[in-house]
Amino acid sequence: MARHSFFCVDGHTCGNPVRLVAGGGPNLNGSTMMEKCAHFLAEYDWIRTGLMFEPRGHDMMSGSILYPPTRPDCDVAVLFIETSGCLPMCGHGTIGTVTMAIEQGLVTPKTPGKLNLDTPAGLVAIEYEQDGQYVERVRLTNVPAFLYAEGLEVECPDLGPIKVDVAYGGNFYAIVEPQENYTDMDDYSALQLIAWSPVLRQRLNEKYKFQHPELPDINRLSHILWTGKPKHPQAHARNAVFYGDKAIDRSPCGTGTSARMAQLAAKGKLKPGDEFIHESIIGSLFHGRVERAAEVAGRPAIVPSIAGWARMTGYNTIFIDDRDPFAHGFSAA
């Protein structure tokens, strides 16, 4: 019987948790981060479930594990883990990971103030602002984002038939905007959104195909983005992003903000150089920007950037003990 030890740096990005695994992560095979992610899921997924689920984590927990880069143009590689699995890319996770990794000396950038991350979704370029030992702000230039489909019809519990757009910003998002059977996220409780979202996601994945044209392993819709009018005077829009099985993102969601900008750009509501300030369900803000136009397999796209902040909350040495009947975690219904 073994006791596995993991040294973690815990923090949050604009309110949403990030658990950075700084020690104890497994060695992974593969020439790309997508291949390493596949190896992790095949052999070491118990680490993810043990660290993310109760009793060591919770429904909203997400995290990351650092690795040497698989490509020469990157400083460090990141594997993103959460309750739903491994993500190709995670915006809030990136901001939190970079903040804590720089502050704790876990990575040394080739150029101070800049960092290139090797992620399963591709290269993510980082610029960060540091004041003494603290990182005050991180801006990530994300992978290309694009509108994938418009006006997909789906039956929502309690609401009835609704239409969604689907956009990619590092993950596939179903974007629910005001319409006949849906008014504004503020008119519904978080518990209602949590109850409806997995049903919507399942029905959309059963009815429609979601396939990234260049990344074969990204082949399902994973997130639901509920929209609403902003409350913060600086914000352009507000959102509540559902992920995993029972989680609403406390941050404005980085890949979700990227997907939303791609949707708006495709409809002529944003253009290169435009700013887009996105508000979360708890009032925190991400500052988005359309950096430039792009293409993904001939499909119009944008390169978005997202800026936000994170704070470290503590150090955590976590044991996963084979003697523990809940070694690999659990999720209460």
Curated annotation (Swiss-Prot):
- Which top EC class is given? isomerase
Under Gene3D superfamilies, the record lists:
Diaminopimelate Epimerase, Chain A, domain 1
What Enzyme Commission number(s) does the record list for this chain? 5.1.1.8
The record lists substrate as bound by 91-92, 249, 254-255
SUPFAM superfamilies found in the cross-reference section:
Diaminopimelate epimerase-like
| UniProt keyword list | Isomerase
Instruction: Describe activity control.
Output: Inhibited by iodoacetate, iodoacetamide and by high amounts (10 mM) of pyrrole-2-carboxylic acid (PYC). Not inhibited by PYC at 1 mM.
InterPro entries reported in the protein's UniProt record? Pro_racemase_fam
Q: Where is the active site?
A: 90, 253
One protein family per Pfam: Pro_racemase
Molecular functions (GO terms):
4-hydroxyproline epimerase activity
Q: Could you tell me what reaction this enzyme catalyses?
A: trans-4-hydroxy-L-proline = cis-4-hydroxy-D-proline
Q: How does it assemble?
A: Homodimer.
Family stated for the protein in its record: Belongs to the proline racemase family.
Q: What PANTHER family does this protein map onto?
A: TRANS-3-HYDROXY-L-PROLINE DEHYDRATASE (PTHR33442:SF1)
* Purpose: Allows intracellular utilization of 4-hydroxyproline, one of the major constituents of host collagen, by converting 4-hydroxy-L-proline to 4-hydroxy-D-proline, which can be further metabolized by intracellular 4-hydroxy-D-proline oxidases. Strong B-cell mitogen. Plays an important role in the regulation of intra- and extracellular amino acid pools, allowing the bacterium to profit from host precursors and enzymatic pathways.
Q: What else is known?
A: This enzyme does not require pyridoxal phosphate (PLP) as a cofactor.
UniProt name for this protein:
4-hydroxyproline epimerase
Question: What organism does the record attribute this protein to?
Answer: Brucella melitensis biotype 1 (strain ATCC 23456 / CCUG 17765 / NCTC 10094 / 16M)
